[in-house]
Amino acid sequence: SGKHISTEVSFYNMDYFTKALVLFLLGFIVSCLGWLAPQSKAPKKLTWILSLSGVGMLIAGVTIRCLIQGRPPVTTLYETILFITGCCVLTAQALEYYDRRNIALTVSTFLGALGCFLSNRYELKEAVTAGDTMPSLVAVLDTNFWLSTHVTTVTLGYAAGLLAAAISHVWIFSKMLGVKKSDPSYYKSLTRMVCGTLCVGLFFSVVGTILGGIWANYSWGRFWGWDPKENGALMICLAELIILHLRM
């Protein structure tokens, strides 16, 4: 419709995701500088402003895409990267709100910048190969119910798993570089964040995988077929289960 066309033109003119990328990059740089001056509160406040502004631009862009297309933002790899990036940043910000060590906040800006950069590369690829970054859905995927339940749920699980992996790498590199050797609470805090995020990721991954099987059964008459996507979902669930059981 004419309304959707004008909205889409405005969406491309605003370039939300490039602006989000710039904000996240600035936030990451400021946060890194803040680690060099831990007594100063100004870098952390500025990082919060940049991180919140970045995720605000990201959410605005994703929301407008949803309104234009009339479906959840998880139907292509490009959209999925943006959705996962937003979920990672919001979850990291929530962790920082409770932890207040500047670890999760730094991770939020790093993952935000990385996700927006990767999405930009896939946007260019879709524009060249498909001729459109908002392509029509294939018939089997054209159902808002399963896109809103299975795909969104399992993607939330993957986002939590990605965030847990990022925080785990902070733990590893901190140990390698001897960061805060005399502060065991630093590593305990990282461990708590990883375990908590993994629990959330495992819940959504398991529920999303089961919902995917139900959708597959409705669509082509079988719950599980051992195809690459199903195997990948199962491996993520098993990996998170192993980590949590070893922690116990």
Which residue ranges define each predicted feature?
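Hydrophobic cores of alpha-helical transmembrane segments in multi-pass integral membrane proteins
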Residues: S1, Y16-R71, T75-M134, T143-L177, ...
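Soluble non-transmembrane domains of integral membrane proteins
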Residues: S1-F11
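Helix-loop-helix junctions that connect adjacent transmembrane helices in secondary transporters/permeases
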Residues: K181-K188
